């Protein structure tokens, strides 16, 4: 049986509304310092395995380093205490004054706690500080069942 993958392209152009993070107690979202590409690769593999994230699985260490050290890329990490919970990556495109939400996800053991929407809200708030023309994301029917409604 062949099933079609539905793709969705979404954008935000109005950043005037304040976004409520609803960050639970003992959770924090930190901006990664780009020292360690292993963190991005870990999240990509662990979260992506359930959603058919495949394009970066064959990347070499040097490809990961080049990606993570891009001066316009930010990786934000959600933690509970010292435990890793989830992340998102966003890239600022200065030529078009846009922010692209590249990847976002929560580790399996933390799903069902509405932390994905917390990360989305944080990403919007973070992007808005750059005063972009728009923020955009694409998702598809292979992503988490709540991804589209969260965006």
Question: Where is each model-derived feature located?
Answer:
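Acyl-donor-binding surface of acyltransferase catalytic domains
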Residues: 1-33
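Short amphipathic alpha-helix that is part of the acyltransferase structural core
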Residues: 22-56
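A conserved beta-strand-loop-helix scaffold within acyl/acetyltransferase catalytic domains
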Residues: 57-59, 68-75, 79-98, 102-106
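Conserved acetyl-CoA pyrophosphate-binding loop and the N-cap/start of the following alpha-helix
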Residues: 110, 114-122
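Conserved GNAT acetyl-CoA-binding A-motif
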Residues: 127-139
């Amino acid at each position: 049986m062949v099933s079609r993958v539905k793709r969705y392209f979404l954008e935000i152009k109005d950043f005037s509304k304040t976004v409520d993070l609803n960050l639970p107690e003992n959770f924090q979202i930190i901006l990664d310092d780009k020292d360690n590409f292993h963190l991005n690769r870990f999240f990509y593999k662990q979260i992506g395995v359930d959603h058919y994230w495949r394009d970066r699985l064959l990347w070499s260490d040097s490809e990961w380093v080049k990606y993570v050290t891009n001066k316009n890329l930010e990786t934000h990490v959600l933690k509970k205490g010292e435990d890793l919970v989830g992340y998102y990556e966003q890239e600022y495109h200065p030529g078009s004054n846009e922010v692209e939400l590249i990847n976002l996800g929560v580790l399996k053991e933390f799903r069902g706690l509405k932390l994905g929407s917390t990360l989305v809200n944080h990403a919007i708030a973070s992007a808005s500080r750059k005063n972009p023309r728009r923020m955009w994301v694409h998702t598809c029917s292979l992503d988490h069942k709540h991804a589209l409604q969260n965006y």
